[in-house]
Amino acid sequence: MKKNTSPILTGTAFLPDGTGCASPTSHYTFLPSEKVIVEKVRFRNRFRIEVVGDLYIPKNIDRSRKHAAIIVGHPFGGVKEQTSGLHAQKLAERGYVTLAFDASHYGESGGEPRFVASPDINTEDFSAAVDFLSLRD
């Protein structure tokens, strides 16, 4: 009988950025846009939980004026590097300022225990996001 000598590969694959390391955006499920600037932002909700988000700003926007913004949330169990970030980026490419954030207890945001869905806290996260954006210069 012939023995199978094919190697078995296990582990996690990643796409290198040319330096042999994973790129800083490798945890996103979509490619970054050349038309958009992304800023990491942090703010607290009224439960004092730190909420972490990505603010998507069109590169050609007039920063001397205030602009309307769209807040994009993720489904329960998701994070900002997935669908909500993609939607936020696509809207920013069309000229809107957008914010995609990790809900409390998920992703980079705080909150214990982890991976708990609370409609009350989730609603407060959106309220805190509105407050954060309205107070921003």
Regions found by a protein language model. Give the residues of each.
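Positively charged N-terminal leader segments that act as targeting/secretion signals
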Residues: 4-7, 12
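N-terminal cap/lid segment of alpha/beta-hydrolase-fold proteins
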Residues: 18-68
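Active-site glycine-rich loops that stabilize anionic/oxyanionic intermediates
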Residues: 67, 74-79
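Structural cue for short, hydrophobic secondary-structure segments
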Residues: 72-75, 100
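The serine-hydrolase catalytic nucleophile loop
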Residues: 77-89, 103
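Glycine-rich "HGGG/HGxG" loop immediately N-terminal to the catalytic nucleophile
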Residues: 82, 105-117
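Alpha/beta-hydrolase active-site loop
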Residues: 83, 116-137
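Conserved alpha/beta-hydrolase
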Residues: 90-110
